[in-house]
Amino acid sequence: RRSSDLGKGKDIKDEPLTAKVTRSIILLDTIPYRPRLMDSRIGIFPTMKNEYSAAKQTTRSIYYANRWRLEPSDLRGYIEGKKVTPIKPIVFYVDSCFPESWKASIFEAVNQWNEPFEKIGFTQAIQAKEFPKDDPEFDPDNLKYSCIRYAPIGIENAMGPSWVDPRSGEILNASVYLYHNVIKLLNNWLFIQTAQADKRVRHKVIPREVMDDALRYVV
């Protein structure tokens, strides 16, 4: 293929390529988090394990629920029904490269998740923070840090990969990637799915407050 085919969605063969790759390795806790069996009626991601037994000729698949390690800082108060902070809150670091008009919606989207966490007894369980500017150890490519990243390319989508402890299903990292043209996707969704009921989206330019709410939904 010619070099001019690059970026046009075509297969490229016999062309030189340079790729920068980050390898991130973390040490798991000696004692894994207590696993919880997945309930297929609840829409969460599972981790599968195969159980081998000398008493059976075949393996049995076990599915653990992928979940964060949220442990109460005040166990006694938690048992008594008080709302407590977790020992280790869930922290998402927000990319400083996002368009300014997106940032408020992203922070609000993360903080809104504190509402369901409060119903199970945790306050300040999840936090959104800006990329640290004065921490030389911070690296958004390090699995130690869950991040919400800005991808300045023309894909109309967002994605949220996660990495878990295979022994228990404990979520170790869950980063979110927002591609720049996710806004175009939201415009299409809003018009096609809601225009019949919402006259605000029956325009070429959808009002800012409607788009902000849609962006919170995606995050």
Predicted regions and their residues:
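Extended, hydrophobic alpha-helical segments in both membrane/secreted and soluble proteins
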Residues: 106-110, 214-219
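Auxiliary tRNA-acceptor-end handling modules of aminoacyl-tRNA synthetases
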Residues: 1-98, 116, 120, 131-218
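Zn2+-dependent metallopeptidase catalytic core
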Residues: 97-125
